[in-house]
């Protein structure tokens, strides 16, 4: 039992989720949270390095988001309206 308490305390100190209780509201330093998907209900949250903002492939996704949503994103964060597999392909190409 002490081992479990120690594990939970360590997770809390490190900022990890204990049984999924942590809210997904912030991104680590140097990263940007984006919501990806075409359906309003099936959006997935992804963390991308802020350096991607300078990449032409990622900028094309941002332009698509601007055309569809302007600056009013329904998820409260940056929403990219494309299939998740397309997003993953783009980000893997940027990674090299």
From Swiss-Prot:
Disulphides: none
Listed InterPro entries: SAUR_fam
Mutant phenotype after disruption: Reduced rosette weight and area at 22 degrees Celsius but not at 28 degrees Celsius.
Domain of life: Eukaryota
Location(s), subcellular: Cell membrane
Bilayer disposition of the protein: Peripheral membrane protein
Induction: PIF4-dependent regulation by temperature. In low thermo-responsive cultivars (e.g. Col-0), higher expression at 28 degrees Celsius than at 22 degrees Celsius in petioles but not in leaf blades. In high thermo-responsive cultivars (e.g. cv. Alst-1 and cv. Ang-0) higher expression at 28 degrees Celsius than at 22 degrees Celsius in both petioles and leaf blades.
Signal sequence segment: none
Keyword Cell membrane annotated: yes
An example Gene Ontology CC term for this record: plasma membrane
GO biological process: auxin-activated signaling pathway; response to temperature stimulus
UniProt KW keywords: Auxin signaling pathway, Cell membrane, Developmental protein, Growth regulation, Membrane
Pfam families: Auxin_inducible (PF02519)
Cited function: Functions as a positive effector of cell expansion through modulation of auxin transport. Involved in thermo-responsiveness of plant architecture. Enhances plasma membrane H(+)-ATPase.
Cross-referenced PANTHER family: SAUR-LIKE AUXIN-RESPONSIVE PROTEIN FAMILY-RELATED
Similarity-based family: Belongs to the ARG7 family.
Protein name per Swiss-Prot or TrEMBL: Auxin-responsive protein SAUR29
Taxonomic lineage of the native organism: Eukaryota, Viridiplantae, Streptophyta, Embryophyta, Tracheophyta
């Amino acid at each position: 039992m002490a081992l479990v308490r120690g594990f939970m305390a360590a997770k809390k100190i490190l900022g990890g989720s204990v049984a999924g209780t942590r809210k997904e509201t912030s991104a680590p330093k140097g990263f940007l949270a984006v919501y990806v998907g075409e359906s309003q209900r099936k959006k997935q949250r992804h963390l991308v390095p802020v350096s991607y903002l300078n990449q032409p492939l990622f900028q094309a996704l941002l332009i698509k988001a601007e055309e569809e949503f302007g600056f009013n994103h329904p998820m409260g964060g940056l929403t990219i309206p494309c299939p998740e597999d397309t997003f993953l392909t783009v980000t893997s190409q940027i990674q090299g």
